[in-house]
């Protein structure tokens, strides 16, 4: 689901410490907005399109993308007659290497409308896999791009390279990333710009990238580390297509619109059956872009102890499990729920009806648009609101575990419009003035009602949030 409504919020950091911290994280990883990012290249207007600029593909541009495109692949068992001239001394994949390559193939099939079929007959395969020991050009790995006229392309890997000698093919390993990268080439994806490992001068982000998003935070097809665009993966590599890879491959072949159509959990308690989406313990390292097609879905990062920043908006990046910008959400995808860990987390909702649970720690909870259900968990938590649109009377948020004297509701940056220069202030009854706030307690339901009037008679355009539990006090609020 794309964001249909946008929240406008002030960039004037005159709010509370927590509200200003939220603003910082709403702008995280956005070039020109995030002060921690050095922008060496201008952002692309369509970075995904850059990956398919050569229009390399299987089939034709006008093929029906609603029908899955079938590709056969094979692991070579002997030296082929058409082995590239600059490599020699063929060797076959062992079973562990085959299994890793199949996981990379599966990761592309998960996001694109492509049906991969394995065949033992190499001659009928569209994509082949093989190793070599010697390269006249010093190649580590390479693959050939497809065209509508071709019937077969090969992917080749240097068996004597440190990556494969060390068998670094597990999830987050460089070998696994290499398989995913080279398979991307066989499907028609290029490097983000016109550089290659065979260039006389080794490519660098500064000298070879032509736009900001050319990093391994955005695409497995890049040569350049994620730190160039502000992220930090602490030495691990993506095992699956990332944000711009997914958009690019779907533009060519269409999307896989049936995968993960039910309620899906990513992270701890994952039901994805994908290792790169799964956290097993507090030492797990996650690196992925979530592609999801339906259901009521959850980012469960409850087992991590570090301070996390979890953003549920499409095309956004989250800091999870001690890494920076390591989790993102594909364009057009809605993840409804998030569960934080035991650190001091920031949870940011989208325009769906989110369920956000902070867990232990002093968390910042921001539901955004939609009728949200919010839990701070243990610790001193702050629920921030920036606009009446985030909890109008007909789509009210519910805060379920507020503890008076510990937790806070922060409206210090609440947008009251041009007429609300006086800020939010408590009154006994609404009189129609902008910024008037009323706090009521229902002793029967044990629910607090907090409302803000934007002017005139209180109506569906105003603000109303429900707070479950014991009576709360005006001192539990941070006003503008």
UniProtKB/Swiss-Prot annotation:
Active site per UniProt: 182
Binding-site list for Ca(2+) 1: 260, 263, 292, 294, 297
Name of this chain's protein: Serralysin
Binding site for Zn(2+): 181, 185, 191
InterPro entries assigned: Hemolysin-typ_Ca-bd_CS (IPR018511), Hemolysn_Ca-bd (IPR001343), MetalloPept_cat_dom_sf (IPR024079), Pept_M10B (IPR016294), Peptidase_M10B_C (IPR013858), Peptidase_Metallo (IPR006026), Serralysin-like (IPR034033), Serralysin-like_metalloprot_C (IPR011049)
Single GO cellular component term: extracellular space
Recorded family membership: Belongs to the peptidase M10B family.
Entries under Pfam families matching the protein: HemolysinCabind, Peptidase_M10_C, Reprolysin_5
Details of cofactor binding: Binds 1 zinc ion per subunit.
Positions that bind Ca(2+) 2: 295, 297, 334, 336
Species of the source: Photorhabdus laumondii subsp. laumondii (strain DSM 15139 / CIP 105565 / TT01) (Photorhabdus luminescens subsp. laumondii)
Keyword Kinase annotated: no
Biological process per Gene Ontology, one example term: extracellular matrix organization
Hemolysin-type calcium-binding repeat residues: 339-356, 357-374
E.C. no: 3.4.24.40
PANTHER family in the cross-refs: MATRIX METALLOPROTEINASE (PTHR10201), MATRIX METALLOPROTEINASE 16 (PTHR10201:SF294)
Catalytic activity: Preferential cleavage of bonds with hydrophobic residues in P1'
Cofactors demanded by this protein: Zn(2+); Ca(2+)
Location relative to the cell: Secreted
GO molecular function: calcium ion binding; metalloendopeptidase activity; zinc ion binding
Keywords assigned by UniProt, alphabetized: Calcium, Hydrolase, Metal-binding, Metalloprotease, Protease, Repeat, Secreted, Zinc
């Amino acid at each position: 689901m794309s964001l249909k409504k946008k929240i406008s919020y002030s960039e004037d950091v005159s709010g509370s410490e927590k509200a200003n911290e939220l603003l910082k994280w709403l702008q995280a990883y956005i070039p020109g907005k995030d002060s921690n990012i050095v922008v060496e290249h201008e952002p692309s207007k369509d970075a995904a399109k850059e990956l398919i600029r050569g229009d390399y593909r299987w089939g034709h541009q006008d093929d029906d993308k609603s029908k899955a495109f079938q590709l056969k692949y094979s692991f070579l068992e002997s030296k082929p007659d058409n082995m590239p001239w600059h490599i020699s001394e063929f060797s076959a994949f062992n079973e562990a290497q085959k299994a890793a390559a199949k996981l990379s193939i599966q990761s592309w099939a998960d996001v694109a409308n492509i049906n991969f079929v394995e065949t033992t007959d190499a001659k009928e395969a569209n994509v082949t896999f093989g190793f070599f020991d010697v390269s006249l050009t010093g190649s580590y790995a390479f693959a050939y791009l497809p065209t509508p006229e071709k019937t077969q392309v090969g992917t080749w890997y240097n068996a004597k390279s440190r990556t494969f000698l060390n068998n670094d093919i597990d999830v987050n390993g460089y070998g696994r990333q290499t398989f995913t990268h080279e398979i991307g080439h066989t499907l028609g994806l290029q490097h983000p710009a016109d550089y290659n490992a065979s260039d006389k001068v080794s490519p660098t982000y500064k000298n070879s990238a032509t736009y900001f998003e050319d990093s391994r935070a955005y695409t497995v097809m890049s040569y350049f580390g994620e730190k160039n665009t502000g992220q930090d993966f602490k030495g691990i590599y993506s095992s699956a297509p990332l944000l711009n890879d997914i958009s690019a491959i779907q533009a060519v072949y269409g999307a896989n619109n049936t995968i993960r159509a039910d309620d899906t959990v990513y992270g701890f308690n994952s039901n994805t059956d994908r290792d790169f989406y799964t956290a097993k313990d507090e030492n797990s390292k996650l690196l992925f872009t979530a592609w999801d097609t339906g259901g009521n879905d959850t980012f469960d990062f409850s087992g991590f102890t570090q301070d996390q920043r979890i953003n549920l908006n499409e095309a956004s990046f989250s800091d999870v499990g001690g890494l920076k910008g390591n989790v993102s959400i594909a364009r057009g995808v809605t993840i409804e729920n998030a569960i934080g860990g035991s650190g001091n987390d920031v949870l940011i909702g989208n325009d769906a009806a989110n369920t956000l649970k902070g867990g232990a720690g002093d968390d910042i909870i921001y539901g955004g648009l939609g009728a949200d259900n919010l839990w701070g968990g243990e610790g001193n938590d702050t629920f921030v609101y920036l606009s009446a649109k985030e909890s109008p009377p007909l789509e009210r948020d519910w805060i379920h575990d507020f503890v008076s004297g510990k937790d806070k509701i922060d409206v210090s940056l609440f947008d009251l419009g041009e007429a609300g220069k006086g800020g939010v202030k408590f009154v006994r009854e609404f009189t129609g003035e902008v910024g008037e706030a009323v706090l009521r307690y229902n002793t029967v339901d044990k629910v607090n009602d907090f409302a803000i009037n934007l002017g005139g008679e209180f109506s569906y355009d105003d603000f109303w949030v429900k707070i479950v539990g014991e009576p709360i006090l005006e001192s539990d609020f941070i006003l503008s």
